[in-house]
Amino acid sequence: MKSDHKEFKLKDSVERIDQIISSRDDCFAELDGIPSRNSLTFTNGFYVKCSVLFVNIHEPAGLNDSNPQTENLKLYRACVSEAIAVMNSNEKCLEINVVENVVSGVFNTPWRENVDDVFTTAAKISSIVEIINCKFKKNCSKKATLGMGLSYGKALMVRAGYRGSSVTDVIWMGDVIKEAATLATYGNKEPTDRETMVSELFYYNLSEQNKKLLTLNSFRNCYNGDVLNSYFNNWQKLNCP
């Protein structure tokens, strides 16, 4: 959220606090899908069923130094750029956020085939990063690796921020968000961890064909796999061997 530097007034602050305290407790409806942002006020909210994808871009050595190597920064930017581009191409993706080395998306998935589409989105991101690594290998000594977490469940969607200013945003809360974020940290962490980590409920909603691409990771209590998009993968073999 970009600041707009409005004067802080204690009287107005107390009024805003009182409005939040006095807001009704029954104004949080449960929905099967994600409503428009315009439906949100500073006193209501929605419990919505959704799918969440977190992409953890494991940082190349030196990226957090005070003067990161240019090649590392370019590699990071390319991964963030294309992860966002792939998520944005999915019409069910309603929210995209970037915090440090993590790109996340919230998807409206009222039908099981929509969950499969999110799984396909993750596979495309995995494949595009393989292409990025191939493109960078002549100029960059580092290689980008990912950890991806996919989860399905209920999230709380609320508007939060400074009422009366432009410093507001939609906030997503709930176990489904935390679960996807945690699973992403497991991706490629240990030799037994694959790149794409999928929650049990997300796995349950996948097609039988997609389920076959994953195996049980009993240590992480999830399913995992190294899943690529066949079209992207074939392009890489032909154009970036």
Regions found by a protein language model. Give the residues of each.
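Intrinsically disordered, glycine/charged-rich C-terminal tails and inter-domain linkers
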Residues: M1-S39, E179, N188-P241
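Generic serine detector
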Residues: S3, S13, S22-S23, S36-S39, ...
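Charged, low-complexity, helix/coiled-coil-prone segments
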Residues: K6-D32, E59-A78, V118-I132, G147
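Mixed-charge, polar/low-complexity N-terminal
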Residues: D26-F28, D32-P35, S39, N44-Y47, ...
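Catalytic NTP-binding/metal-coordinating core of nucleotidyl cyclase/transferase enzymes
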Residues: S36-T120
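Catalytic beta-strand-to-alpha-helix segment of the class III nucleotidyl cyclase homology domain
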Residues: W111-N229
